[in-house]
A protein has these predicted regions:
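Conserved SAM-binding loop
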Residues: 3-5, 83-203, 215-229, 287-294
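Acceptor-substrate binding/catalytic loop of class I
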Residues: 30, 207-220
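Short low-complexity, flexible loop/linker segments enriched in glycine and/or proline
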Residues: 32-33, 137-141, 204-205, 249-253
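Conserved class I S-adenosyl-L-methionine
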Residues: 50-96, 114
Length: 297
């Protein structure tokens, strides 16, 4: 195990006990989550060594990599993903109607395919060999395994949909992504928000913690601190309202001894409604998309 003793964002060493969370998906091990007393970044620590992280993704329940779904939550996930592909494209075309796009952590490639069909020049990065192969078949292009495989390519838009929380080298990854951004380009970073109403409701059983796959856990404050630390400027924050329903249903499953039934779906739906209602004033939704650009004039 690797013990993180310093916040990578603000370099503060005062990491305070926050939650003890179970890995409900694969190992059923318990992991500690600590919170930086200065910037509020929450950190899974101790965490598995980087070379051992892959085994914690080896489950058909990890839908974004397996492409498989079963049961009520799997159905909800697939339904939400189908809608979100078009929704994400619309968010991007608010800024540009065409150009080059890098999807960092592209999974099985559905979002890239959506952008390809809209005449965008697409590039994808995906570390999972199985997901990468599916993305290559779907899009008929080479998908890179890591950022290090890119040379001096630059992009008008870079997207990281629920992936930054997975990377071991947080600061270095954001710095590398910034280096591949064209002048005037925008990076879209989507992550769970551990200060959302549904996170406050479910606490250590909140599915958004997803330890140990999620190594970092963000609040709006900590994400803004991260962006500023690498010279990126936050230009907008967009809620992902559907996430509250899916995450709440999973959280209800965890409360129900990891068994999904109709009551979990109903309670999760109600919790999602409640979370979205309470999140309105402060834009404190279950998941948020942060739009950032370089602060260079």
């Amino acid at each position: 195990m690797v013990d993180i003793v310093e916040c990578p964002v603000c370099k503060n060493t005062d990491l305070q006990k926050f939650y003890h969370c179970e890995d409900y998906t694969v190992s059923h091990e318990t992991f500690h989550v600590k919170q930086c007393a200065q910037c509020s970044l929450a950190i899974t620590t101790p965490r598995p060594e980087t070379e051992h992280l892959a085994k914690y993704y080896q489950s058909d329940e990890y839908i974004s990599h397996s492409g498989k779904s079963s049961g009520g939550v799997g159905f909800v996930y697939k339904l939400a993903r189908s809608f979100s592909l078009t929704w994400k494209r619309a968010r991007i075309t608010n800024f540009r109607t065409s150009g080059s796009i890098l999807d960092f952590g592209c999974g099985t490639g559905e979002f890239l395919n959506t952008m390809r069909l809209s005449n965008w020049n697409i590039t994808g990065i995906e570390p999972s060999p199985e997901a990468r192969l599916k993305a290559e078949i779907l899009n008929s292009i080479k998908i890179y395994a890591s950022l290090d495989e890119l040379t001096d390519q630059k992009f008008d838009i870079i997207t990281a949909w629920h992936v930054i929380e997975h990377v071991p080298d947080l600061l270095q990854t954001i710095q590398k992504l910034k280096s591949h951004l064209n002048k005037g380009g925008i990076i879209f970073i989507a992550v769970p928000n551990y200060q959302s109403p549904d996170a406050q409701q479910y606490r250590e059983q909140w599915a958004g913690f997803d330890v140990p796959r999620h190594l970092w856990h963000f609040s709006k404050t900590s994400m803004n601190s991260l962006l500023m630390s690498v010279g990126l400027k936050l230009v907008d924050t967009i809620p992902m309202k559907l996430d509250a329903y899916y995450v709440s249903m999973l959280s209800e499953k965890y409360k129900n001894k990891n068994k999904m039934d109709l009551s979990c779906l109903i309670k999760g739906f109600i919790s999602g409604l409640r979370s979205n209602f309470l999140a309105r004033k402060k834009i404190n939704y279950s998941s948020l998309i942060y739009l950032a650009k370089t602060d260079e004039v």
